[in-house]
Each structure stands twice: as structure tokens, then as C-alpha cells.
């Protein structure tokens, strides 16, 4: 037999083996008899994402198709067999009771080559635990109280700019203005920098904020590859963050840290907390890792605080105004509360008065239910797990787990008339009756959103000052029903939120 024949035979055998391996991977759930859709050969259950369908449309349609069929449905996270949770009882096991078996999110990250991916949201294992412990002190109620006046100052500037826009035209695209408000808040608190995006919509920070959410180094195929073969992608030094965004945030952080250290400047903000963690006397954790932050780690945490903080809060505020514009009775009730609370504070919100904005808090909570900005929670199984009472349903080690919280929030078994905006869903009485995992805009358990307090604070301050002085209603340009951006992982309106605004 010739060498060529041997090589050809070996090649064909290898190809045959790979095809069989490929097929067996994409038949995992079907062979076990677990309900699932037939996967696409490359995209798995994510077929059409960012082109024909948004991420949330995939989660919602999958949930509605399979709910009631068992504790979870089979899913294919690109080429990886994954678990798609259908019951809140299983969500509670994963997020809280069996958290140690589902600690990691399982998203691709590569801090060695892509420093901004070394952020708390993406880190796994001991690296996540160490970083979470480092940052836990930065979002205490005491730290929120320190940052409160800064947020109010920017919010007052925001209402002035908003009023100027209304004076020019009563029809306002609120999404962009709200994003400029939260950009200035986060820029000030995270970097100590006057971003000035309220005055200049093309300010550098605002531009980079936009790009950080829409620009990616990889296309759909590349994203599918790094999520299907994360270890290989790291060995190939693959990166997710676009080069201009990495350069900008690394430069800003280096300059900010150097300026504060050289001039002994203290601002009692998020950046100060990170600098303290960088400069504290060298300590080593029980696992042997340094508990001092590097400049790259500071940049990564500041970046995620900025990118996630401005977008999630501004999106929530925009959808709140969108619903209030369609529900004038609710808007009048929340305005009355805001006016009374602020009047008691001699016209200036203070930290202690925020607890009195009870109905506004219900409005924000209901907005987060209907428009869950992060509509799916991702975890990765760290050891084989049999679902209690369902021996057929086993989550294998290494499997991605998806909890479609946005779809669950619109399940009539959890909320009566689930597509109707009703802040009374979050009255104190109903909240007490409800299991915590039935409302998951910030996740739950040890890996819930560390910035939850800050996000809620800036949204409530901004909304309170806006609603106090302005009435919102729908106009010809208002999109009803809402249409969503197909390219973003987060929930976002497709073409802005146009409302009519007038002073009261």
C-alpha cells in the first residue's frame, strides 16, 4: 500500500471521526429524550441571532414553547449542549441553594490578552471570589451615601438640559438624553471626570459608551467559536474588546490613577476605592493570590461599571417613561409622591428621603419586570447535578445553564396579566408573598449584581427630578408596541423612545 493511500485513509478516518463526534454533540438532548429544538450545525439553538432574531426573542420563544414540559429544556449554546431552565424552583437551586456547583457564568474572557475582559462580571472560580471580596466594600450603603450628592448634582444639570430641549420641541427622544445623563454620572463616580455629554452629545465618553455596546472585535461566527471552544480561543490569544475601546479606557484609567496619586486627591468615589485596593499593604489570600489590584484590573472594573451602569439605568428609565406616558393615572400618582417628598426636603433630594419614594420604587421594579435589561442569567455547571425529583434530568459538568428571567417575568403563572404595566405588582404586601427568584433583574444569590444599589439609586434620582417637573405623553412618533434592537445582548429599543414632554 502506498504512502499516499495510507495518508488518505487516515485523513478520511479522521474526518469521519470528527463528523461522528460533531453529530453526537449536536444530538445530546435528542438521544436522552429531553425536549429541545433541532440545532443549527454551527449556531446551535442561536440560529438567526443578531440578524433575524434578537437574543431576547430567542429566550422568549424557547421558554414559551417548552414551559411545562419539565424542569428544563435542552438547548445548544452554539455548539455546546446547554440547559434552558423552565422552572423557578430549579433557578433557585442553581442561583442560591446549590450555588457552589454553579458559581461560574461561563462567558469567554481572556485577561492576559484582553485586559478589559478581566472584569468581575466575566471572571470565574477563585479569581471571581477574590475580586468580589475586593470590591464588596465599594457598594455599601455608606459608599452610596458618599456618592449621592454627586448623582443629584448631575441630575439637576440633566433636568436643566431636558427643559432646554423641551423648550425647542415638545417631542423628545428620551433614550439618548437619559444615556447622556447616566454617562455623566458614571463618568464622574467611576473616573472622577467631567464627561460633559449632557452639554455635548458627541463628547468622547459618550461616544466610547455607544461604541462599547455596539462594536465588537468578532462577528457572529467568531463569537460562536470563542463560546464553543474557550480554551482553544485563549491559546490562540483571541480577544473580544475592540482595540479603540481598550486603548481609550486603559489610557483614561492610567491618567486618572496617576493624577490622583501624584496630587493626593480624594473624591470618595468608586475610583478611590479601586486605588485603595491597589495601594493597600501587600496581602495574599488563602489561595495564594495577591489581593492588591493591578492597573489592568482597575481598568477592567471601571470599564464594566461604566459600560453596564450607564446603559442599564438609562434603558430602565426610558422604558419607565414610555409606560408612564401610556398610563397617566400612574404617572400622576408617582408625580404627586415625588413632589411631596422633595418639598419636605426643602426642594433638594437627600439620601434619607429616598426611602419615602415608595411608589416610584414600585414603578422602577415593574419596569424591570416588563423590560428586563439583562433578560437571561448564564451559569456553568461545575459538577454533575441531578435535578431533585427528576432523575432523567442531569446537568453535566461543564454545561452552560441559561435562566430566561425576562421570559419568566411575563409568565401568567407568576404575574396576573403579565404584559400589563402594574406597579401594584410590587406593593410591600405582594413582595412579601413572592419568592425572590420570581423577580431577577439583578440575579439572586452570591453572584447577584454587585452594583444593584447604585443602579437603582441613579435611576430613582433621575426619574424623581424629571417626573416632578415634566408631564410625559405619547405622540405620533412613539412606537407602540415597542420594537427591540436585534444586535444587542441587552434589551434596547430599536429606534429610540419618542415622547411628548411639557412642564407641569
From Swiss-Prot:
One protein family per Pfam: p450
Q: Which residues bind heme?
A: 449
> GO MF terms on file?
heme binding; iron ion binding; monooxygenase activity; oxidoreductase activity, acting on paired donors, with incorporation or reduction of molecular oxygen
The UniProt entry lists membrane topology as: Peripheral membrane protein
Q: Which GO terms describe its cellular component?
A: endoplasmic reticulum membrane
- What keywords does the record list, in alphabetical order? Endoplasmic reticulum, Heme, Iron, Membrane, Metal-binding, Microsome, Monooxygenase, Oxidoreductase
Q: Does the keyword Endoplasmic reticulum apply?
A: yes
Xref: Gene3D superfamilies: Cytochrome P450
Give the location in the cell: Endoplasmic reticulum membrane; Microsome membrane
State the InterPro entries in the record. Cyt_P450, Cyt_P450_CS, Cyt_P450_E_grp-I, Cyt_P450_sf, Insect_CytP450_Detox
Q: Among its keywords, does the record have Zinc-finger? A: no
Q: What is its EC number?
A: 1.14.-.-
Q: What is its main location?
A: endoplasmic reticulum
Per the entry, which co-factors are needed?
Answer: heme
- Entry similarity comment: Belongs to the cytochrome P450 family.
Q: Write out the function statement from the record.
A: May be involved in the metabolism of insect hormones and in the breakdown of synthetic insecticides.
Q: What is this protein called?
A: Probable cytochrome P450 6a21
Gene, per the UniProt record:
Cyp6a21
Amino acid at each position: 500500500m502506498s504512502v499516499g493511500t495510507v495518508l488518505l485513509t487516515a485523513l478520511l478516518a479522521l474526518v469521519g471521526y470528527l463528523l461522528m463526534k460533531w453529530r453526537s454533540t449536536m444530538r445530546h438532548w435528542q438521544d436522552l429524550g429531553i425536549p429541545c429544538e433541532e440545532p443549527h450545525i454551527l449556531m446551535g439553538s442561536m440560529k438567526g441571532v443578531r440578524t433575524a432574531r434578537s437574543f431576547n426573542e430567542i429566550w422568549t420563544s424557547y421558554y414559551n414553547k417548552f414551559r411545562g414540559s419539565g424542569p428544563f429544556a435542552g438547548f445548544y449554546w452554539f455548539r455546546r449542549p446547554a440547559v434552558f431552565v423552565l422552572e423557578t424552583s430549579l433557578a433557585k437551586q442553581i442561583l442560591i441553594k446549590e450555588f457552589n456547583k454553579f458559581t461560574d457564568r461561563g462567558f469567554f474572557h481572556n485577561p492576559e490578552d484582553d485586559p478589559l475582559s478581566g472584569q468581575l462580571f466575566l471572571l470565574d472560580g477563585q479569581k471571581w471570589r477574590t475580586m468580589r471580596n475586593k470590591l464588596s466594600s465599594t457598594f455599601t450603603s455608606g459608599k452610596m451615601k458618599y456618592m449621592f450628592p454627586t448623582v443629584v448634582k448631575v441630575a439637576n444639570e440633566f433636568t436643566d438640559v431636558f427643559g432646554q430641549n423641551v423648550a425647542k420641541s415638545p417631542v423628545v427622544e428620551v433614550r439618548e438624553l437619559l444615556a447622556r445623563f447616566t454617562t455623566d454620572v458614571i463618568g464622574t463616580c467611576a473616573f472622577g471626570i467631567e464627561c460633559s455629554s449632557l452639554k455635548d452629545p458627541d463628547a468622547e465618553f459618550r461616544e466610547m459608551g455607544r461604541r462599547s455596546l455596539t462594536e465588537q472585535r468578532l462577528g457572529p461566527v467568531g463569537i460562536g467559536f470563542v463560546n464553543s471552544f474557550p480554551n482553544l480561543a485563549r491559546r490562540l490569544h483571541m480577544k473580544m474588546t475592540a482595540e479603540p475601546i481598550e486603548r481609550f479606557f486603559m489610557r483614561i484609567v492610567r491618567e486618572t490613577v496617576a493624577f490622583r496619586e501624584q496630587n493626593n486627591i480624594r473624591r470618595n468615589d468608586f475610583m478611590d476605592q479601586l486605588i485603595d485596593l491597589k495601594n493597600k499593604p501587600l496581602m495574599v489570600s488563602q489561595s495564594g493570590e495577591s489581593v492588591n489590584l493591578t492597573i489592568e484590573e482597575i481598568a477592567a472594573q471601571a470599564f464594566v461599571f461604566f459600560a453596564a451602569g450607564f446603559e442599564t439605568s438609562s434603558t430602565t428609565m426610558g422604558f419607565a417613561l414610555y409606560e408612564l406616558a401610556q398610563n397617566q393615572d400612574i404617572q400622576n400618582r408617582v408625580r404627586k409622591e415625588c413632589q411631596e417628598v422633595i418639598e419636605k426636603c426643602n426642594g433638594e433630594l437627600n439620601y434619607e428621603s429616598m426611602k419615602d419614594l415608595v411608589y416610584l420604587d414600585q414603578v422602577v421594579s415593574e419596569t424591570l419586570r416588563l423590560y428586563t435589561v439583562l433578560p437571561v442569567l448564564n451559569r456553568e455547571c461545575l459538577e454533575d447535578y441531578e435535578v431533585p425529583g427528576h432523575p432523567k434530568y442531569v446537568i453535566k459538568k461543564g454545561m452552560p445553564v441559561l435562566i430566561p428571567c425576562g421570559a419568566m417575568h411575563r409568565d401568567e403563572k407568576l404575574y396576573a396579566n403579565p404584559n400589563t404595566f402594574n406597579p401594584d405588582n410590587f406593593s410591600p404586601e405582594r413582595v412579601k408573598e413572592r419568592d425572590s427568584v420570581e423577580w431577577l433583574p439583578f440575579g439572586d444569590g452570591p453572584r447577584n449584581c454587585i452594583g444593584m444599589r447604585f443602579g437603582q439609586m441613579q435611576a430613582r434620582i433621575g426619574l424623581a427630578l424629571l417626573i416632578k417637573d415634566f408631564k410625559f405623553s405619547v405622540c405620533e412618533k412613539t412606537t407602540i408596541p415597542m420594537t427591540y434592537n436585534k444586535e444587542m445582548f441587552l434589551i434596547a429599543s430599536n429606534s429610540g423612545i419618542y415622547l411628548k414632554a411639557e412642564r407641569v
